[in-house]
Amino acid sequence: MTDLTRASDSWLTSLPHQQWLHDQGQTLLDFAKAARVPFGFAQLDRFGRRADTAPADTITTARMVHSFSLAHIQGLPGCAPLIDHGLAALAGPLRDTEHGGWFASPHAQDGNTRKAAYLHAFVALAASSAAVAGRGGSAELLGDAVAILEDRFWAEDEGALRESFARDWSDCETYRGANSNMHGTETFLALADVLDEDLWLDRALRMAERVIHQHAADADFLPIEHFDAHWRPLPDYNRDNPADGFRPFGKTPGHGFEWARLLLHLEAARQQRGLPVPEWLLGDARQLFASACQFGWNVDGGPGIVYTLDWDNRPVVRERLHWTLAEASAAAAALLQRTGEPMYEVWYQRFWDYIDLHMIDRQYGSWHHELDHDNLPSETIWPGKPDLYHAYQATLLPRLPLAISLASALKLRR
């Protein structure tokens, strides 16, 4: 296995480029600080404003805790109070003190009392990063989140996460989602590192094998998103709601990039810990990246990555979402680190050129979260600018090794 192979003229080894990434990350952090509300963090509009009545939500809060933990570990001022604020919200109003787990909003004020794997994966990720940052209360939160993942969501017989439950943990949803298992894989990689337990890497491998090596390989290496409880694909799922923000119809090229990066992290982590490393991890990562580029990039007459494709790999929802470019650039960086092959340098520079030209909002701050097919700001799928996590990680990942969690890697660099 080639470890962190970088050409001498690569942007990955360029000090000015690394400084540019750092500066871009700082700008993103400064914008996101306005999202603080009494019970956690809320979503911001495209101007960086939040309404006085804007509610906190658990996914945003968990992602902010994770992101500000990464910043605090680097020694960036002003982040520790934000981490502690988010941890207090996750330990308090966002938590179900009766049945355990977390609501989507404080005290389930939005009426949604279901417990979702996607959300709980982010709570565990936030707690793990806050623990590395040494914040009070993070260890207790991490223990509780891990217990919920193990006792409620992890299905040993499936080698994957169950999707959701009713508030009292009855009514297990018959749907299985690649998206929640993808973020579960991300979280399990962090847990293996922070808890020093190989078990989480074995579970991550089982999820990746099911979703990617078994199913995506049969779909041109574009991840199939939706399955029934027996892991049979649901090709018509949300055909009448193709632009859903979490469960869109068809295939999602952006998730191909994201999975490609995660497979490389998994490969490196398993090698570092002396665990068996399947050859398909690298092979599938290459294929995922190639397919996402072939079918997602510049396929409708303009630059950018379309949100979704149909089963013939034709664009369905042509909006360009910011997280897809963040993940594309990070995947290119990971493959460049892993292989040293020049084509990944070309893609890495191409994606960041696009981000700089189209995504970065130099008038109001942060990144446009959505552009239409003419690369003009749009709010069809995602209103406002609620997300720090994807873009901020994109500024960090190219500067860090593949093998350990972001939080631990940043701590080692200090």
What are these regions (language model features)?
Residues M1-R414:
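Glycan-recognition and catalytic cores of secretory/periplasmic carbohydrate-active enzymes
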